[in-house]
Amino acid sequence: MYDVVIIGAGVSGSACARELSKYNLSICVVEKEEDVCCGTSKANSAIVHSGIDCKTGTLMAQMNIRGNEMMDELSKQLDFEFRRNGSLILCFSEDDMPRLKELYNQGIANGVPGLEILDSKKAHEMEPNLSDEVVAAIYCPTGGIVCPFGMNIAFAENAAANGVEFLFNTEVKEIQKEQAGYILITQNGEIHARCVVNAAGVYADVFHNMVSENKIHITPRRGEYELLDRAAGGIVDKTIFQLPGKYGKGVLVTPTVHGNILIGPTADDHDDKDGTNTTRAGLAHVTTSGTRSVPSLPMRQVITSFAGNRAHEDGHEFIIEELKDAPFFVDCAGIESPGLSSAPAIGERVAAIVERLFKPSKNADFIETRKGILNPKKLSEDEYKELIKEKPEYGNIICRCEMITEGEIMDAVNRPLGAKSLDGVKRRTRAGMGRCQAGFCSPITMEIIARERGISQLDITKSGGKSKIVVGMSKNRG
């Protein structure tokens, strides 16, 4: 029996695992997919929100502000990409100025530092490519951008280094109460836990409702995005929002930490928790809305589109608490935007709840830091030459779009919680994330995965499950 079982290895579940590993507890993370960061955490805006948009007094506002504050130190400790680039919220009409000022006042009430209302001239001085329609903007200097994959993986790897066990390809089918805690019934057998942390994203309501009479409901809210080539990078430096509406913050235009431009999301409620397809209408809306903010966006440089589901709870609020009618069952539910920004604070809050329940001793051997995959592009020319002398695989470029080496892919496969699929390698190294979208490097990456894991290429998938790539070999190859 584990002390704590966490359902879900997204950014919230992984942040909880990392925080809980600071205590002497037996912890297991159960994930139905083949890797961490396979749900909402892999398909979002990659934004660290300032906290201006959250309703004052809500848990959502509290978690957003605290998570934002934690990001600088965490990104250094855990070695993931984060940049505090600031954000602008645009107003296109004098008629909307009262709403802009209301949003500004809400941000002040939430404790967001450094907010400033800019007139059109100052906004365009800050971002010259903004639409001429812009009459004013709110500047939020604490807004930032982050690599969501890198952040999620960093939390999980650090948790694993501190003794947390991860069970992948393990789907929870049912949860039963027992005297000592809970039984999680999976396709791989039963898992017993004294305490359960429900961080299951769009499925969090399903697990909550298995153990509680106080039902909740989560609607999948699909958001579609378009990603522009790195050649388009530099058209904006700040994250560009429009005034938020009923369904969220609207379509944004933002740089990514790797130099692309990201546009999106839409906000379409539907009933398929696994429905992450894009639509012609959705992508057309992304283009129309994005070019309203930044008319010169080079939309011919879109290299891919994608969609993700946000876990929209009917009350539009984070639910992070022990259930009154299910002791030792802790919800981490309704985690939609700003969930990525809030994840570090969510981990803190869940750990505080569990600490109150167990009163465990501190883990004296807790490892606070984690080193990510070596990026040769950040080395000096002399340092890179020395690296290649020592490890020649770092001189073999596999992904030409993103200049990713064999050494980086080998590290991604062999490190704790290493990549097993093409998408797993992509999330860790960016191999396959460039202009050709893995058209060139996939076969070579598969050879490396097969070699390093000692498996056949026939067993390698794009993203786990039934996403097989090769069904037979035409030559005597691995």
Role assignments for model-derived ranges:
Residues 2-29:
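N-terminal Rossmann-like FAD-binding beta1-loop-alpha1 element of flavoenzymes
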Residues 15, 175-264, 268-279, 288, ...:
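Flavin-dependent oxidoreductases
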Residues 22-42:
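Glycine-rich FAD pyrophosphate-binding loop
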Residues 55, 62-65, 92-99, 138-157, ...:
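Short beta-strand to alpha-helix junction loop
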Residues 248, 257-258, 274-397, 404-417, ...:
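C-terminal catalytic lobe of FAD-dependent flavoproteins
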Residues 405-416, 439-457:
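Iron-sulfur (Fe-S) cluster-binding segments and ferredoxin-like electron-carrier domains
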